[in-house]
Amino acid sequence: MAENQYYGTGRRKSSAARVFIKPGSGNIVINKRALEEYFGRPTSCMVVKQPLELVDMVEKLDLYITVKGGGISGQAGAIRHGITRALMEYDESLRPALRAAGYVTRDARCVERKKVGLRKARRRPQFSKR
């Protein structure tokens, strides 16, 4: 690829995204597919574009993304985190705006483990008085 590209890794739940940014016309390619083709629902596309819209670079950068693991929501969050990190590598002056929007912090929430004696993480077995 080009020599003036910037990289960022993003993670969310069990998903991990590798994001490569280079100056271009606004193409977003995820796992060799277009953004709208990869994510069927508009909310996921919106989540992916949030950091770019915040710093007003939707039409100025091309993104090449590979993402693995998890589901649609987790992958979208991982991509957003990766784009944010790549943008900060591209221009460090964008960090305060991205930090204020809450995109820099990795969302550490993940599935709570199932406990012994319970049906799920917190769901108890049905209680019978008699």
From Swiss-Prot:
Protein name: Small ribosomal subunit protein uS9
Domain of life: Bacteria
UniProt family annotation: Belongs to the universal ribosomal protein uS9 family.
Record PROSITE patterns: RIBOSOMAL_S9
Keyword Ribosomal protein: yes
InterPro entries registered for this protein in UniProt: Ribosomal_Su5_D2-typ_SF, Ribosomal_uS9, Ribosomal_uS9_bac/plastid, Ribosomal_uS9_CS, Ribsml_uS5_D2-typ_fold_subgr
Keywords per UniProt: Ribonucleoprotein, Ribosomal protein
UniProt GO MF annotations: RNA binding; structural constituent of ribosome
Organism of derivation: Vibrio vulnificus (strain YJ016)
Gene Ontology CC: one annotated term: cytosolic small ribosomal subunit
Biological process per Gene Ontology, one example term: translation
